[in-house]
Structures are given as structure tokens and as C-alpha cells.
């Protein structure tokens, strides 16, 4: 993923954090619907969404709604629900790791800015 000069690193990190939050909410929704007959697991393509978010930011576009899709290939129970708590727990852990990574990157970026401000003193 190339990071364009058109957007600041802080803006890109903010969009990354927004997507990590969206992924967490999507996973939570799947978990909340584990007992809903006929519910189909929803997912998102994090990398594609991040590329779009960076491209949109470079063009001055606002953050758009995340595109979700039903996840194919999962085994459905007799009631038609295909949510797996094990799969969703793993997805939640991955989303939390992405969020923690984004927060760490934001701290580094903020420190870099502070260092630049204080470099002349």
C-alpha cells in the first residue's frame, strides 16, 4: 500500500483506526446474532477498504460507509445461521490487534511531530 503525499500520516492512521473500529463492530454484530435463525455472517475486506480510504482521503473525499458482504463457505446450522463463535472470537482478536497497532502508530506520529516542533529550541 502506497501512502500518498496528498494526505498526512495522521489522517491515514485515523482512517485505519476507523476501519479497525468498523471491523470490531461488524464482528460484535455477528456475535450478537449467533442465535438469530437464518442470519448469515458478514465480513469486510480490510485491505481493500484501507486502500479506498487512502485514495478517498487523497482526493479530499469524506470517509464513506464500509462495504460488507456475506461470508461464503461457512457451515450453517439447521436454522440457517452460519455464525461460528470461534471464528468471530479470532476476528475480534485480530481487529483488536489492528486497533492497538493504529494507536501505537498514532503515538509515534504525534511524538515525531512534537520532536520536529522542539528541534529548533
Predicted regions and their residues:
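Amphipathic alpha-helical polymerization modules
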Residues: 1-121
